[in-house]
């Protein structure tokens, strides 16, 4: 039996690497036809997990408009597209370059921007592009800490640190799940950042963007709004508009609340900043981009142009209804005194179940998919202290605020150890779902 080509990576946790090498050994032992069959089986299994047996309550994922998803397999992605529309390096790109412009125009319309960079392949790289356009290695930036959802890309282990920046965590307003403005002003005066970032992996209430912009101006810094999770809420006008409030740029993932293909997007009204970002994208780090993804993004943005206001409002109302229903079941939903949430996300204090990841694994046994998140409360040893929940996908599937007491009951019962019966009920509920909502057909 052939040995796997992959070798053990001593820097990877042993349990994970044992799992990897087991899969690799199985693949190495198969002939080509068997590997092809196995890939098809795994794709079908993923469909069962997400679309037959489960409900995604993870706000980092969504379901795409089938018309947009179909564009990913229409022969566009393997066609390199270097240069500006009207002057491409390769020939035969007359159609693809028009797709690129349509995607950028729709992004500008939806986000109220003058400029859009659609070639970025991920939200993390979108952040890196802005870091590179505003800072030099060795510069200091102020970023949201993990306790208020600050993403790793803003920190030392992520894009910021890998580029050589010195991230400093912003002071926290725990009750508002955002930054403490007065303390931020003091910190900015001390460390003189080149960039201040706001927005993260959990956003419950609007961030004080105008006040942060004033602080940034006072120290000569730029302001980046990371809308990786908030992109749909911003696009649907259910959230304050960051560019109008003073952000120099918005970065985002395009597959979370926005419900598009995997990738990134940058929008801005600052011409000088976007000129630098454009040069980073081409001929810098992006060069060729996936035109299939660009087409799928354009088709997804069209959904927001037509249905965005209704979809975003429905997400907010449904998230609030779920928070109230969980609270009524006795679950410790974070910041009850503030009304739980004004976004599509909410969080549960998870110490009772050993932490957020432990809680997520419990409800996953009931077909409810979620994950942990950091909260500005007492830590949980060996785990994250919060459970993050979101509603973008279930709202698109047709769930409404009226369904949230049932969903809260499933979550509570799964956490209490009744996952098997919950899983059966979730599977049955999925059989009654109709067509996707809030899409252009």
Curated annotation (Swiss-Prot):
A GO cellular component entry from the record: cytoplasm
Membrane-spanning intervals of the chain: none
Family matches, as InterPro entries: PyrdxlP-dep_Trfase, PyrdxlP-dep_Trfase_major, PyrdxlP-dep_Trfase_small, Ser_HO-MeTrfase, Ser_HO-MeTrfase-like, SHMT-like_dom
Domain of life: Bacteria
SUPFAM superfamilies (alphabetical): PLP-dependent transferases
Cofactor dependence: pyridoxal 5'-phosphate
UniProt record, GO biological process: glycine biosynthetic process from serine; tetrahydrofolate interconversion
Keywords per UniProt: Lyase, Pyridoxal phosphate
Keyword Coiled coil: no
Residues modified as N6-(pyridoxal phosphate)lysine: 256
Pfam families, per the entry: SHMT (PF00464)
Function: Catalyzes the reversible interconversion of alpha-methyl-L-serine to L-alanine and formaldehyde.
Subunit (UniProt): Homodimer.
Descriptive protein name: Alpha-methylserine aldolase
Species annotation: Variovorax paradoxus
């Amino acid at each position: 039996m052939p040995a796997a080509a992959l070798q053990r990576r001593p820097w990877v946790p042993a349990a994970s690497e044992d799992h990897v090498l087991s899969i690799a050994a199985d693949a190495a032992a198969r002939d080509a036809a068997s590997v092809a069959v196995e890939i098809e089986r795994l794709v079908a299994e993923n469909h069962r997990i997400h679309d037959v047996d489960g409900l995604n309550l993870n706000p980092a994922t969504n379901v795409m408009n089938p018309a947009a998803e179909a564009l990913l397999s229409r022969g566009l992605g393997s066609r390199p597209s270097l240069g500006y529309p009207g002057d491409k390096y390769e020939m035969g790109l007359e159609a693809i370059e028009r797709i690129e412009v349509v995607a950028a125009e729709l992004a500008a319309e939806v986000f109220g921007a003058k400029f859009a960079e659609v070639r970025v392949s991920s939200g993390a790289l979108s952040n890196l592009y802005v870091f590179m356009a505003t800072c030099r290695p060795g510069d200091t930036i102020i970023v949201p800490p993990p306790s208020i959802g600050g993403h790793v890309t803003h920190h030392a282990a992520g894009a910021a640190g890998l580029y050589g920046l010195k991230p400093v965590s912003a002071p926290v307003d725990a009750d508002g799940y955002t930054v403490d403005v007065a303390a931020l002003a003091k910190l900015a005066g001390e460390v003189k950042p080149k960039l201040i970032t706001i927005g993260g992996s959990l956003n419950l209430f609007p961030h004080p963007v105008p006040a942060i912009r004033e602080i940034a101006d006072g120290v000569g810094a730029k302001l980046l709004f990371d809308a990786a999770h908030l992109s749909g809420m911003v696009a649907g006008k259910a959230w304050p508009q960051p560019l109008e409030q003073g952000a120099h740029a918005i970065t985002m993932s395009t597959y979370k609340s926005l419900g598009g293909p995997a990738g990134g997007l940058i929008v801005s009204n600052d011409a000088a900043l976007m000129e630098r970002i454009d040069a980073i994208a081409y001929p810098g780090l992006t060069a060729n981009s996936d035109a299939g993804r660009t087409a799928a993004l354009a088709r997804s943005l069209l959904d927001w142009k037509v249905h965005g206001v209704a979809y975003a409002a429905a997400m907010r109302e449904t998230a609030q209804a779920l928070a109230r229903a969980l609270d009524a079941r006795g679950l410790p939903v974070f910041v009850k005194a503030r009304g739980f949430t004004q976004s599509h996300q909410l969080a549960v204090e998870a110490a009772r179940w050993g932490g957020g990841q432990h809680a997520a694994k419990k409800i996953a046994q009931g077909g409810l998919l979620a994950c942990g998140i950091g909260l500005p409360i007492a830590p949980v040893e060996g785990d994250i202290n919060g459970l993050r929940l979101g509603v973008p996908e279930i709202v698109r599937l047709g769930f409404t605020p009226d369904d949230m007491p049932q969903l809260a009951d499933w979550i509570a019962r799964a956490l209490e150890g009744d996952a098997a019966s919950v899983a059966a009920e979730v599977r049955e509920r999925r059989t009654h779902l109709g067509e996707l909502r809030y899409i252009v057909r």
